[in-house]
UniProtKB/Swiss-Prot annotation:
It catalyses: a hydroperoxide + [thioredoxin]-dithiol = an alcohol + [thioredoxin]-disulfide + H2O. This is Thioredoxin-dependent peroxide reductase, mitochondrial. Changing S139C: Forms predominantly dodecamer rings. Keywords: Acetylation, Antioxidant, Corneal dystrophy, Cytoplasm, Disease variant, Disulfide bond, Endosome, Lipoprotein, Mitochondrion, Neurodegeneration, Oxidoreductase, Palmitate, Peroxidase, Phosphoprotein, Redox-active center, Transit peptide. Its EC number is 1.11.1.24. Gene3D superfamilies: Glutaredoxin. It is found in: Mitochondrion; Cytoplasm; Early endosome. It comes from the Eukaryota. The active site is at C108 (cysteine sulfenic acid (-soh) intermediate). The gene is PRDX3. It is linked to Spinocerebellar ataxia, autosomal recessive, 32: A form of spinocerebellar ataxia, a clinically and genetically heterogeneous group of cerebellar disorders due to degeneration of the cerebellum with variable involvement of the brainstem and spinal cord. SCAR32 is characterized by the onset of gait ataxia in the second or third decades of life. Other classic features include upper limb ataxia, oculomotor signs, dysphagia, and dysarthria. Some patients may have hyper- or hypokinetic movement abnormalities. Brain imaging shows cerebellar atrophy. Changing D202N: In SCAR32; unstable protein leading to its degradation, reduced glutathione peroxidase activity and reduced PRDX5 protein levels in patient fibroblasts. InterPro entries: AhpC/TSA, Peroxiredoxin, Peroxiredoxin_C, Thioredoxin-like_sf, Thioredoxin_domain. The modification Phosphothreonine is found at T146.
Length: 256
């Protein structure tokens, strides 16, 4: 893996940095130190070929909240078997589509296992979860067949989708073009195929499954009740009627 990541930093940068471990962000790995290593900020501002290695796929074409999610189709591992999977398979359901950098890494299995362990709670609210990386479906299966105590995934209750061509990651605006890896992008897509939420993390930090589930429930509540959800809303907390007069009911209740 060190060799693969090292290809991110070709030419002069490669003389200073031999690898970026997956527990460290690209920004941290290139932070100026006493030895005078070049900072990532300088690389990005220089317009050099090295800087382009860290650019993502064209942000001007990246999907946005309220827009329809880009169509995708590929081979996934579902219940230990290979299966064709597309966005059309989730019509009428909510979908959490989350991207991760690579199989057999460090933060990634913690996220995937956490989502898998909560799969039934997502199913209870008519929501499916799909994880995506640029690995092959064969790699996904090998990782699933690796015990968790050895960094593997074990039995999975969610689908792992292969994006070997990198087109899905590119279409969703999370592909790091130089390395060919995807950032930790997460998209909540409603039953009509519309993006309700998106977030993108740098490589070293995993995401909250509980927060993702809370957001799905919040969007569903708004659709069902026509009221809006305040900060830190949970299903047992009050909501707001979206009008100047009616909203006072909420503010009076929480500011007693």
């Amino acid at each position: 893996m060190a060799a693969a990541v090292g290809r991110l930093l070709r030419a002069s940068v490669a003389r200073h940095v031999s690898a970026i471990p997956w527990g460290i962000s690209a920004t941290a790995a290139l932070r100026p130190a006493a030895c005078g290593r070049t900072s990532l900020t300088n690389l990005l501002c220089s317009g050099s070929s090295q800087a382009k290695l860290f650019s993502t796929s064209s942000s001007c074409h990246a999907p946005a909240v309220t827009q329809h999610a880009p169509y995708f189709k590929g081979t996934a591992v579902v219940n230990g078997e290979f299966k064709d999977l597309s966005l059309d398979d989730f019509k009428g359901k909510y979908l959490v589509l989350f991207f991760y950098p690579l199989d057999f890494t460090f933060v990634c299995p913690t996220e995937i296992v956490a989502f898998s362990d909560k799969a039934n709670e997502f199913h209870d609210v008519n929501c499916e979860v799909v994880a995506v990386s640029v690995d092959s479906h064969f790699s996904h299966l090998a990782w699933i067949n690796t015990p968790r105590k050895n960094g593997g995934l074990g039995h999975m209750n969610i689908a792992l989708l292969s994006d070997l061509t990198k087109q899905i990651s590119r279409d969703y605006g999370v592909l790091l073009e130089g390395s060919g890896l995807a950032l930790r992008g997460l998209f909540i897509i409603d039953p009509n195929g519309v993006i309700k939420h998106l977030s993108v993390n740098d490589l070293p930090v995993g995401r909250s499954v509980e927060e993702t589930l809370r957001l799905v429930k919040a969007f569903q509540y708004v659709e069902t009740h026509g009221e809006v959800c305040p900060a830190n809303w949970t299903p047992d907390s009050p909501t707001i009627k979206p009008s100047p007069a009616a909203s006072k009911e909420y503010f009076q209740k929480v500011n007693q």
